[in-house]
Amino acid sequence: MTASTAPRALSSRLPWTHPLFWFAAISLAHVAMRLLASPALKWDEAEQILWTQELALGYGPQPPLYTWLQWAMNQVFGPSVLALSLLKHGLLALTYSLMYLAGRELLDERGAFWASASMVLMPALGWYSVRDQTHTILVTAMACGAWWLLLRIVRRPRPLDFALLGLVCGFGMLGKYSFALVAGAMLLAALS
């Protein structure tokens, strides 16, 4: 190791130099801002507080997974803006992290970071998800996870990745029924 590469090698081991650290930090900042902004609930948040009073196999037109996850958060933190915000922004951090991992299958670290970070430019993720969305965030995270696993399978097929892809697709369908479009598109792409 030369003197010119020593700082670079050291900095690559520091946690704050990794993109996943920043995705988590931004999500925690969003949680803090949501808690400071208002104790009032948005439409989807109020719906979750109502639905998480009991476990069911479905909630209105929505499949159950998001509400089950929210129920678990409420068991730990109580039915609160904190519990709602931690789940939502935790799933957003997971979404960006899974897209980063998918990007790493095709790009270098910098390219994968920008592929993931650029998702904030889509109004559905960059604005509406922070304001008031629930199931859409979960299905987007599962779509990013499925994309990452499919890319891993294409490059290095392993039984574990196939099992994980099946699990993620199952979670996607339990998160929002529109995941069927993602699964169908992935199947068509894999067959071509």
Please identify what each model-predicted range represents:
Residues 1-30:
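Start-transfer (signal-anchor) and selected internal transmembrane alpha helices
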Residues 23-26, 115-124, 169, 173, ...:
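Short helix- or helix-capping micro-motifs
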Residues 34-48, 58-70, 78-83:
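Extracytoplasmic catalytic/substrate-binding loops of multi-pass membrane glycan-assembly enzymes
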Residues 64, 68, 78-97, 113-116, ...:
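Loop-to-helix entry region of an early transmembrane alpha helix in multi-pass inner-membrane enzymes
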Residues 86-107, 145-149:
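Transmembrane-helix motifs of polytopic, lipid-linked glycan transferases
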Residues 110, 146-164, 190-191:
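Membrane-interface transmembrane helices that cradle and orient dolichyl/undecaprenyl
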Residues 128-138:
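Short acidic/glycine- and proline-prone juxtamembrane loop motifs at membrane-interface regions
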Residues 163-167, 173, 178-192:
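Transmembrane-embedded, aromatic-rich helix segments that form part
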